[in-house]
Amino acid sequence: MYIKRHLETTIEKLNSCFKVLLVTGPRQVGKTLFRGLAAVDRTYVTMDDISVRSLAMTEPALFLQRYKPPLLIDEIQLAPKLLPYLKMYVDEQGQNGDFWLTRSQAFELMHGVSESLAGRIGIVNLLGLSHGELIDRPAGPFVPENEFLLRRVEESPLLPMSDLFDQIWQGSMPALNSASEQDWNCYYSSYVQTFLQRDVKELAQVNDELQFYRFLCAAASYTGSMINYAALAKEAEITAPTAKQWLKVLAAAGLVYLLEPFMHPNLKYGVKAPKVYFTDTGLAAYLLRWSNAEILEAGAMSSSFLETWAVMEIYKSFSNCGQIPPLGYYRDFNSREVELVLNVDGSIHPLAIRKSSSPVKETKKFDILRPVTEGERALKLGAGGVICFANDLLPIDARNWYIPAGLL
């Protein structure tokens, strides 16, 4: 079953603006769909083919004579020597849309690309399926303004808690959301093994797979939480500097998203540590051994998984439109926290996330953000709300809403 990806429209726009297009993202999130998009008029080559890779590495000029644009080059990181020749080609005779490149992770390739193809390349990041893609809803950045939310109500069916936790546990990988009967445990077992055996050895120079696996499981237990490197290191039996470096590896691989604190000169008492979110809740559930959705929903980490899912849905709503997600969070030294702060067009939009159908008094803590409305760098305090399991979109006050999770 083919599920249309929201990023396809963004690809079409960038293709008309840049000579080179790079698609990055974690393994198995659906980058092969671009092979389908390219099938009509674009040659496809993969650097997994040793003969093609050998030609690209030893005779890059000859490679470009053999494979003319428009061209899709898969796993470009395996042939880094080709990048300077791509630059020369597009400078001398390139046209917009000449080359599409795909890469399973960002890592060191991004440094090489930024140096070799600066100003010539459009970069997009593909993650797993969004809720909007699964229900075939139009794409668009999630900004909780009144008009947007009222339109979303018409586009989105109600999502009961049990159905949402089915989706959270299942995860966002296309292979697990297609018509094929893919075994969940077998899929994620293979996924983790591939990551450890190929990516970790190649990109983190880690030879002890078991040690990194312990770290990966420990990191999963922090999803939806502020990171404490010392505690994470103790749990994984490594040093704190190593834990910090390995978490950066997971972020570069696209397995986790580090949500930085929202900063403003008028907010002087906020914590500075990031929060960590696994980009695929199914992978986090597998690593933490939640064996089914019902147990996860009733478990101690259910709220953390709900927050992870909600943050990543909002993140994807921006990234799938080719925008850098304007997300942060704010927590003061009195442990008052706004789970998500969207900074859009001079306004901040505070959001709380609760596993409840009728959370109360959650918007009062939004007042800790009021100092940003004063001074030279003042921002407006825009519409916000509480993402929850309310049966309908309901106003809390003149500015805030109870937002059913299915609207994300």
Where are these regions (language model features)?
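Conserved P-loop NTPase "ATPase switch" module shared by AAA+ and STAND
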Residues: 66-82
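A cross-kingdom feature that marks ATP-driven nucleic-acid transaction machinery
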Residues: 1-47, 69, 248-249, 254-256, ...
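Conserved catalytic/switch belt of AAA+ P-loop NTPases
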Residues: 83-107, 114-116
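A short beta-strand-to-loop transition that corresponds to the Sensor-1 phosphate-sensing loop
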Residues: 102-107, 112, 127-129, 387-391
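Short glycine-rich substrate-engagement loop in P-loop NTPases that contacts/grips substrate
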Residues: 42-70
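Interdomain hinge/linker elements that couple catalytic modules in large macromolecular machines
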Residues: 136-313, 319, 323-325
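Loop/turn-to-beta-strand initiation segments
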Residues: 19, 68-70, 95-100
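Short regulatory helix/loop adjacent to the ATP-binding pocket of P-loop NTPases
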Residues: 107-123, 135-140
